[in-house]
């Protein structure tokens, strides 16, 4: 999303250094574009190829994100890279269309990230309600809203030139229109109104929503982990403690600290995962959107406050686009997609059979934690791969639980973000993606 663009021919480097710099820039930008294309194409191909990935409503949002990032890699990044390497904008009147695509695709990517965070929060905070109401139709409505907003704040203002700052007359009376140089550098100075309003819609409001949702998700996950840890400690305590043969009084037995350490490690890794999700997004896009709001307030002299030189601004632009190359790694590298990618790339034979173990945590009638596992044939695409599933005991509202006990919902809830898969211990993973509703008795609903 780079409406304020300029090329790097102002660096003032000697000819040889300038040529070397352009070569290095070309190599780096080519790798970035190719990695973005490869990652997002794999996500799209996996969803198209494997039916079980299409059966999950949450993957609709992941595929929408991949499409928006793929468009960034096809319609936006290559043309800016050409301008960076050539030192000028070589595509002439294509500038306005490119700017519109840039704003639309970047905004769609960010709004899809926001929708994913809301979807994940709803799935973990109200699993029964989520199972009933998050239908494919509801998902398509949310996706349509994200894309519609992206189009509305991009093509309409750009085509009507609402996004451009009004030309100013300098004190010497010599007027120079921004249009005079537009064919050479595609430099569009945004109006203050458009810069602030578009930044609010494209970034600041979505990032505020994401902070709230992921903070809430962490708190809910923390409660789940501590609840399971308490059940584990109770089971170990009951097993280790024996009664005396004489009077039957319980013998004092020491509490093991291993369960407390494991609980702390689980919470820490959940926090790390959520921090990576938010940290990558904010680090990539925040510098650009801060500068995007500052530049319209910059005066004619670059030494004034709010002014940013063209090279720094270009770096911020590419930082934002780099987020599109990282999204497939963060949001689509859960077990489901990893197996699909391995099959698509033909490298699943390199994976040992032990990696196909599926371990599930459940609670029996006595409230004890039970671990069960089975193995999948090597190379097969399983819905559940090498994960330990957290149980959201009493996460749903009491009203939802009553309806569930009355026989309302039959299917287990198998939804939470691919981005929220974290390691519990050295051998297994915990995934907030797979959450099965439980009743008051501690049993899974079936």
UniProtKB/Swiss-Prot annotation:
Protein's membrane topology: Multi-pass membrane protein
Organism domain of life: Eukaryota
Tissue expression: Brain, in the striatum, the nucleus accumbens, and the olfactory tubercle.
Compartmental location: Cell membrane; Endoplasmic reticulum membrane; Cell projection, Dendrite; Cell projection, Cilium membrane
Annotated Pfam families: 7tm_1
Keywords: Cell membrane, Cell projection, Disulfide bond, Endoplasmic reticulum, G-protein coupled receptor, Glycoprotein, Lipoprotein, Membrane, Palmitate, Receptor, Synapse, Transducer, Transmembrane, Transmembrane helix
An individual GO BP term: dentate gyrus development
Effect of residue 337 to A: Loss of interaction with DNAJC14. Abolishes transport to the cell surface
Protein family (similarity comment): Belongs to the G-protein coupled receptor 1 family.
Protein name, entry field: D(1A) dopamine receptor
Biological source species: Rattus norvegicus (Rat)
Gene (UniProt): Drd1
